[in-house]
C-alpha cells in the first residue's frame, strides 16, 4: 500500500543499513505482490531507503506495546516489527532475496530449479498486476512450485533479509 508523499519522510541509510552486507547484486530484494523493478532502485548496495509516515516523528511520545508472537519471516516479533506499520510504501520493505540459499538468496532453502522457475513466473505476474495475463503467470508459478512444495515468499528459518529490514526501521 502507498500513502501520499507529503505525509511521509524519506530516510536513506546507505552503507549503514543492516541490508548492506547482503546487497551484493542489483535487483535481488523482493516483497509480496509488488513489481520487483520498483524496489531495485530503492534497496540496493550503498542506498537502502525507507519511506515512513511523518506523524510519529512529530509527536512527543509513542507507545509501542509488544505482542509476543511468531512471524513466518521474522521469527519472533515482540515490539520490533510494529514499526513496519509506519511504512509509507511497501516497495521500501524488502522481505526476502530472490533465489534459494545455494544461490545466495533466502526465498527458500537450497537449490530448487522448479522453485526458481516459479519465482520468475511470480516476477512476471507482478509486472502485470491488473491485467488479464497476471492470472496466467500466477497459475504457472503455482504449478511449478508444487514440484517442491512449500512457499515462495521467504517464509523459512533461513530468511536473512526480514530481520535486517526490521532492525533498520528500529534504528531510524
Task: Give, region by region, the residue ranges found by the protein language model.
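Extended, low-polarity segments enriched in aliphatic/aromatic residues
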Residues: 1-172
